[in-house]
Amino acid sequence: MSTIAESARIHPMAVVEDGAVIGEGVKIGPFCHVGPHVVLHENVELLSHAVVAGRTVIGKGTRIFPMAVIGGDPQSVHHGGEETTLSVGANCTMREGVTMNTGTADFGGQTIVGDNNLFLANSHVAHDCKVGNHVIMSNNVMLAGHVVIEDRVILGGGSAVHQFTRVGRQAFVGGLSAVSYDVIPYGMLNGNPGLLSGLNVVGMTRAGVDRAVIHRVRRAYKSIFEGTGSVRENAAAIRDEYADCEQAVQILDFIAADSDRALSSPTRGQKG
């Protein structure tokens, strides 16, 4: 039997299956479908024809627009019907036609989306992805399985991210770009194949990063990608010099971390 809060408003032409948990202030419009294992926290709003399926939890204040399908089975040949999950944080917006899939059992079974994210029309979050907070995915952005998107990333319209790829904090990916390799924090990537084109200085400035700090991060970037060694060797060589610069350290830590993918770079042949 469903648990439906007294203040929830459910249109008589919506379907809420037995077992669903509907929180206070939730609004469910006509022709919506809410599955039996779904939890909608307070003040979630489903506009007409939205679908929330699977073992999915939607955080408070999130809005889901028409024709979005949230919590569908993973699009993976390895999925055997296991009970995997999708967790979406608070105050997200999923515009028309957005799709998000649950995880796969072989990789922990969880797709996780953070808070305050904006997913524009027809964008897709595949199985086992991890999306941070304050992320913007523009129209028709596609995340393949196991992708990690860190906080405050902006992905331009029609861009596609290869499976297992990481996109670092506050990076900016231009429209129609193909992201085949990891993108450093604060990096800007454009094109197909995607290449770094410098730092997201506009984003850093908007975030209140001091101009002198931005100048230091630019110097670090130049040392990393224009030094005589590999990218990882160059990054390790400057760690002590930039130990007091938070943004530079984030870049250096990202480069040093284990990853299934190589690093995006400013030139096609350089991969870390």
Curated annotation (Swiss-Prot):
It comes from the Bacteria. It catalyses: a (3R)-hydroxyacyl-[ACP] + UDP-N-acetyl-alpha-D-glucosamine = a UDP-3-O-[(3R)-3-hydroxyacyl]-N-acetyl-alpha-D-glucosamine + holo-[ACP]. One of its GO terms (molecular function) is acyl-[acyl-carrier-protein]-UDP-N-acetylglucosamine O-acyltransferase activity. One of its GO terms (cellular component) is cytoplasm. InterPro entries: Acetyltransf_C (IPR029098), Acetyltransf_C_sf (IPR037157), Hexapep (IPR001451), Lipid_A_LpxA (IPR010137), Trimer_LpxA-like_sf (IPR011004). Pathway: Glycolipid biosynthesis; lipid IV(A) biosynthesis; lipid IV(A) from (3R)-3-hydroxytetradecanoyl-[acyl-carrier-protein] and UDP-N-acetyl-alpha-D-glucosamine: step 1/6. PANTHER family: ACYL-[ACYL-CARRIER-PROTEIN]--UDP-N-ACETYLGLUCOSAMINE O-ACYLTRANSFERASE, ACYL-[ACYL-CARRIER-PROTEIN]--UDP-N-ACETYLGLUCOSAMINE O-ACYLTRANSFERASE, MITOCHONDRIAL-RELATED. Homotrimer. Belongs to the transferase hexapeptide repeat family. LpxA subfamily. This is Acyl-[acyl-carrier-protein]--UDP-N-acetylglucosamine O-acyltransferase. It comes from Rhizobium leguminosarum bv. trifolii (strain WSM2304). The gene is lpxA.
